[in-house]
Amino acid sequence: MNQEIMNLFNPTTPAQVFDQIRISIASPEKILSWSYGEIKKPETINYRTFKPERDGLFCARIFGPIKDYECLCGKYKRMKYKGIICEKCSVEVTLSRVRRERMGHIELAAPVAHIWFLKSLPSRIGLLLDMTLKDLERILYFEYYVVLEPGLTALKDRQLLSEDEYLKAQDEYGQDSFTAMIGAEAIRELLRGLELEKLEQTLRAEMQETDSDIKHKKLAKRLKIVEAFRHSGNKPEWMIMTVVPVIPPDLRPLVPLDGGRFATSDLNDLYRRVINRNNRLKRLMELRAPDIIIRNEKRMLQEAVDALFDNGRRGRVITGANKRPLKSLADMLKGKQGRFRQNLLGKRVDYSGRSVIVVGPELRLHQCGLPKKMALELFKPFIYSRLDAKGLSTTVKQAKKLVEKERPEVWDILDEVIREHPVLLNRAPTLHRLGIQAFEPVLIEGKAIQLHPLVCSAFNADFDGDQMAVHVPLSLEAQLEARVLMMSTNNILHPANGQPIIVPSQDIVLGLYYLSIMREGMNGQGMTFGNMAELEHALHAKAIHLHSKIKYRWEGMDETGKISKRWIETTAGRVMLGNVLPRHPRISYEIINKLMTKREISGVIDQVYRHCGQKETVIFCDRIMALGFYNAFKAGISFGKDDMVVPAGKWKIVDTTRTLAKDFEQQYNDGLITHGEKYNKVVDAWSKASEEIAKEMMKEISVTKKTATGADADINSIYMMSHSGARGSPAQMRQLAGMRGLMAKPSGEIIETPIISNFKEGLSVLEYFNSTHGARKGLADTALKTANSGYLTRRLVDVAQDCIITQDDCGTHLGIKMRAIVDAGTVVASLGSRILGRVPCDDVRDPATNAVLVKAGTLMEESHIDAIQQAGVQEVKIRSALTCELVNGICKMCYGRDLARGTPVNHGEAVGVIAAQSIGEPGTQLTMRTFHIGGAAQLNEQSFVESNFEGRVVIKNKAIARNSEGHLIAMVRNMVVTIVDPDGSERATHRIQYGARMHVDDGDMIKRGQRIAEWDPYTRPILTEAEGTIGFEDLTEGLSISETLDESTGIAKRVVIDWRGTRGGADLRPAIVIKGKDGKVLKLARGGDARYMLSVDAILSVDVGTTVKPGDILARISTESAKTRDITGGLPRVAELFEARKPKDAAIIAEIAGTIRFGRDYKNKRRISIEPVDKTEEPREYLIPKGKHIHLQDGDIVEKGDFIVEGNPAPHDILAIKGIEELAAYLVNEIQEVYRLQGVLINDKHIEVIVRQMLQKIEVTDQGDTDMIAGEQVDKIEFDALNAKAVEEGKKPATGNPVLLGITKASLQTRSFFSAASFQETTRVLTEAAVNGKIDPLEGLKENVIVGRLIPAGTGASMARIREVALKRDKLILDEREKQAAIVPSQPEPQPLALPPAE
């Protein structure tokens, strides 16, 4: 009996265990098999009794009872009648929960087309039938007939006939001589008549024959969909529906409101319309109504069903009573409020609370202060169970009363319950995983949560009113995970870059900085102390000052780990700091025996973590926090107006710059420079002045002054705050005490007149007005930035969510080469910082001795990096996520170190999500601006390069000429200057601009800081390579050249104008030629004439008949008029790169190495071809718009990958021309550059993981003997699998090239349709998936969250691995049984097997 009662509580339907989910088109039989009955009436519930009407939309007979175990009429009540069907009201006695599961159906009187397959582009029905959407709609909505069987008439198959034509044809050929139909029936017949196998063969044959690219594409599309239907087992006619399923009533509820009205789901209205029209159609058909009426009714039925499935997809949107569009089934899934994102991926939790946060400086790092009131509420169930266990209450009700009265014993129990039970704290927005961390609660009075100051930077929290949420992990497993993985003490390093994130900030930093100052001449200087007690005594007695220079006997550890003592020169403050430092052989006193700025402290924490481990680090952090707070309070550092020092030389600098600006104005008036150049120069001059004033100010403020006694005076407070890294930056100090500087207009341009005053002196009205411009734009930007940054993160997470560490080693030998990143001669990212925590592919050897420094396959630690840098290794080839050969996921070796732990990465780590968060989280710190060139203030134009090393100069691709002024001029674009040190290893390489003046020559010795070359950053020259006299070609006044008078100055200059639009100007090719003594055009050494083509806006620098020498300037293009592209910076640039968009004015890249040849012009484009060096290759041709400046001449030699036209290269071109490694290097460097500008550190591997996900597809170039279609994009995994199958069968495999997809596209094309559908374009993804009968293997994180299983990462990964092993064993056993059965057919029962041992 007991067993039976227990069974009653079991779910009515058994829970399904599944590994994959398949989606396909439902056949009418399938829909009927789901249904529990047909819905015949549009009624919902009776208005008097509130009981559902029979056969209506809420019918209890079909969908089940309203109350648990009670039929509708009330004849059978209670459990004992379970499963009986009442003979009076025909309702089954069961749980009312079945009303959430049971479906119904509507039998349609006429078939209708499913709108998704009709209207979702490309139209699937249209593709299959090879008809246009317009024609299909004409048939479906009863405008035209379609001929199905022309018979012996002159009509064609599938010809459309209007009403009149149809009647005429019937008269002409007789009624039964041909068949033509109209409406969905016609389409259904057409679809039913398709013979897919035959169709596939015809299409393949047609594809072989056709030459037209467009036709080939169209056929490929059709072939793909025909294959999809063949392989998936879907039948084409199922896209036309004869039965409509009705979803369970509890999923479209009707709720009575007070006042006798009802709130209902929109679906009920939509279903009602379908039923009404369907019933009306049935009646009309029974009555044999005229054709036209029936047809109209059928059309209305089609529209009603369309609206039910996807309202507004076709025709006008159907609105409810309040003019609001009704929410159809498709809308239920779509968008942020849809089922996927709202309910499946955005579930809410039950046990949580939220409150304002306040600072808790006396907490330990792993603690948080939880208000008692809050804890009592959150831990209620635990308290009830403890009260019960202790016998203080017998029922829940009693326990509830005790808790409500807040009896003393309740508080004691709360203390017990809370002990060692971590809670999760979360601050929105949770931009990365450190936004949720676990703490042990400490009960406090009051109503605010106390937060430890050191975790603020991880949460990005401050105490100006921020709120935080508290969540309680309930199950034991959850508590365990919270403690082991999420405890704040486990999150010391930042997952994005491996630097400590538990770093003191603000007042702690200030206190530690003050503590570590050393000042000359303070009292007690030179005293000696043996231990801490003596030192403290002297301090309290004021015999010495905290900052006095003293000698101290320090007890450290030597290499062997023994205590060793030595004398050190230090200050009392630094000894106090040294006292909290853990003792370890690798940690010397020297790391804190200096002025402690924020960066230094971060370094110390890093060292302590690396050498002493986590526990010591946590204790150390808590101690320095206490020390910092205490000393900040003792120091009494304040902020006063007189601490801001306006530099004495300010006005002198301002006056000089004003004169300069006047000069530029004058030069412009004299016509020597253009308006744009003047603007550039003025802005440049002012930004330099502003920097100089800032330098002067910093110099004055940072100088230590002496007091009367000769001791060092106190350091300036504001300088201390800024220098320590506690608050404020030199830029802010410049505005306070230097000069406010240049301001930007809302458009992003820079206003020429700077703000000369600073805030201390006060701004004039005009200056104030100018500065409001920029300030307002800043605020508007911030609002936009947050939304954009969040969207970028969402796209990144979506593309990378299924990237998980699944195996130890994929065994690949591939990798990418890493070298230091050098920008304009300075090392921006050293080789060491880039390869730390990665695995080398090959042994790393010392270039001098060839000894192995690091063996291949070793994870490189800090010690290895030191050795590599000492040896001067320039390049290391490392394993990378990009080259990992695992099918799903990445292997440990290719990923390397887990940055947040400093150890090799673990199995099941969700590296994709970590990468996405690391890139997305700093997004809000990036700027939103697109820089317009002109503001040199943002774009410190480089006008020279100087050497950062001593050594010898080596010039590659050397071509230097001495011009008529005697300067050495660089004559080629690919000239590279390398500085080589005495051992012969390269120190630095610099690319030299075309037309630059060289200060050194090949083989010269160079000193540090010496200039190598300089050039004018604002113009691009066109230089001559020959000596001779100038001649003009096609430079006709008024046609291709004009003397423009500058309006404001009245000075003439000669500029090439756009000659293509003028009459008779289309064939002109304006050029400057160099003639010899005989008056003929000179020939150049490299072949070709000395003829220099001019592009629009070139300003001539020479006249006919002038004599020139090699290296002289013939014309110049002002970069402002060469319209150097807008520089997209910040967030938009990162998004552009990840979306792999083609940039505006993209560069044109040479696909092969060879010689440039100018061909005949084509309309208004220049034709350039490359004659390949390798004669087996075809020459390549490029058409370039005439106005674009091509800086190559006829006969120039280009390498593969060189730019023919300058600009940003399109990433697809880089991939096609130079391959994956170059593309990865380009994307990583470009993205890093944006983040570096903002001072954000992100490890390269995160970007590599995302780029790996962008390269998952392959475009088939030749299909071989496989089923793939040339030109289609296939998943890498699928491609390899199909090829392997082909090779196995002895067929020819397909070939293909990798394709780069932007992150949005890549997310929509993942193998999991669940993941794609919940991202964007839900309808399209689901339609596509259903047609293909796709199977979702549920491998990623997102799909598993949607179906409500453990995600296959972290703890879920180990579960998945255990299941894998179990499945393998099951298979072995079954195989073994089959074998035994085959051997001994007579044996009745197979013997039990000895199981193979578990792995």
Curated annotation (Swiss-Prot):
<feature type="binding site">
    <location>
        <position position="73"/>
    </location>
    <ligand>
        <name>Zn(2+) 1</name>
    </ligand>
</feature>
<dbReference type="InterPro" id="IPR000722">
    <property type="entry name" value="RNA_pol_asu"/>
</dbReference>
<dbReference type="InterPro" id="IPR007080">
    <property type="entry name" value="RNA_pol_Rpb1_1"/>
</dbReference>
<dbReference type="GO" id="GO:0003899">
    <property type="term" value="F:DNA-directed RNA polymerase activity"/>
</dbReference>
<dbReference type="InterPro" id="IPR044893">
    <property type="entry name" value="RNA_pol_Rpb1_clamp_domain"/>
</dbReference>
<feature type="binding site">
    <location>
        <position position="89"/>
    </location>
    <ligand>
        <name>Zn(2+) 1</name>
    </ligand>
</feature>
<keyword id="KW-0240">DNA-directed RNA polymerase</keyword>
<feature type="compositionally biased region" description="Pro residues">
    <location>
        <begin position="1387"/>
        <end position="1399"/>
    </location>
</feature>
<comment type="similarity">
    <text>Belongs to the RNA polymerase beta' chain family.</text>
</comment>
<dbReference type="InterPro" id="IPR006592">
    <property type="entry name" value="RNA_pol_N"/>
</dbReference>
<feature type="binding site">
    <location>
        <position position="71"/>
    </location>
    <ligand>
        <name>Zn(2+) 1</name>
    </ligand>
</feature>
<dbReference type="GO" id="GO:0000287">
    <property type="term" value="F:magnesium ion binding"/>
</dbReference>
<keyword id="KW-0804">Transcription</keyword>
<dbReference type="Pfam" id="PF04997">
    <property type="entry name" value="RNA_pol_Rpb1_1"/>
</dbReference>
<dbReference type="Pfam" id="PF00623">
    <property type="entry name" value="RNA_pol_Rpb1_2"/>
</dbReference>
<keyword id="KW-0460">Magnesium</keyword>
<feature type="binding site">
    <location>
        <position position="894"/>
    </location>
    <ligand>
        <name>Zn(2+) 2</name>
    </ligand>
</feature>
<keyword id="KW-0479">Metal-binding</keyword>
<feature type="region of interest" description="Disordered">
    <location>
        <begin position="1379"/>
        <end position="1399"/>
    </location>
</feature>
<keyword id="KW-0862">Zinc</keyword>
<keyword id="KW-0808">Transferase</keyword>
<dbReference type="InterPro" id="IPR007083">
    <property type="entry name" value="RNA_pol_Rpb1_4"/>
</dbReference>
<dbReference type="InterPro" id="IPR038120">
    <property type="entry name" value="Rpb1_funnel_sf"/>
</dbReference>
<dbReference type="InterPro" id="IPR007081">
    <property type="entry name" value="RNA_pol_Rpb1_5"/>
</dbReference>
<feature type="binding site">
    <location>
        <position position="86"/>
    </location>
    <ligand>
        <name>Zn(2+) 1</name>
    </ligand>
</feature>
<feature type="binding site">
    <location>
        <position position="462"/>
    </location>
    <ligand>
        <name>Mg(2+)</name>
    </ligand>
</feature>
<protein>
    <recommendedName>
        <fullName>DNA-directed RNA polymerase subunit beta'</fullName>
        <ecNumber>2.7.7.6</ecNumber>
    </recommendedName>
</protein>
<dbReference type="Pfam" id="PF04998">
    <property type="entry name" value="RNA_pol_Rpb1_5"/>
</dbReference>
<dbReference type="GO" id="GO:0008270">
    <property type="term" value="F:zinc ion binding"/>
</dbReference>
<dbReference type="InterPro" id="IPR042102">
    <property type="entry name" value="RNA_pol_Rpb1_3_sf"/>
</dbReference>
<feature type="binding site">
    <location>
        <position position="884"/>
    </location>
    <ligand>
        <name>Zn(2+) 2</name>
    </ligand>
</feature>
<feature type="binding site">
    <location>
        <position position="810"/>
    </location>
    <ligand>
        <name>Zn(2+) 2</name>
    </ligand>
</feature>
<keyword id="KW-0548">Nucleotidyltransferase</keyword>
<dbReference type="Pfam" id="PF05000">
    <property type="entry name" value="RNA_pol_Rpb1_4"/>
</dbReference>
<dbReference type="InterPro" id="IPR012754">
    <property type="entry name" value="DNA-dir_RpoC_beta_prime_bact"/>
</dbReference>
<comment type="function">
    <text>DNA-dependent RNA polymerase catalyzes the transcription of DNA into RNA using the four ribonucleoside triphosphates as substrates.</text>
</comment>
<feature type="binding site">
    <location>
        <position position="464"/>
    </location>
    <ligand>
        <name>Mg(2+)</name>
    </ligand>
</feature>
<feature type="binding site">
    <location>
        <position position="466"/>
    </location>
    <ligand>
        <name>Mg(2+)</name>
    </ligand>
</feature>
<dbReference type="GO" id="GO:0000428">
    <property type="term" value="C:DNA-directed RNA polymerase complex"/>
</dbReference>
<feature type="binding site">
    <location>
        <position position="891"/>
    </location>
    <ligand>
        <name>Zn(2+) 2</name>
    </ligand>
</feature>
<comment type="subunit">
    <text>The RNAP catalytic core consists of 2 alpha, 1 beta, 1 beta' and 1 omega subunit. When a sigma factor is associated with the core the holoenzyme is formed, which can initiate transcription.</text>
</comment>
<dbReference type="GO" id="GO:0003677">
    <property type="term" value="F:DNA binding"/>
</dbReference>
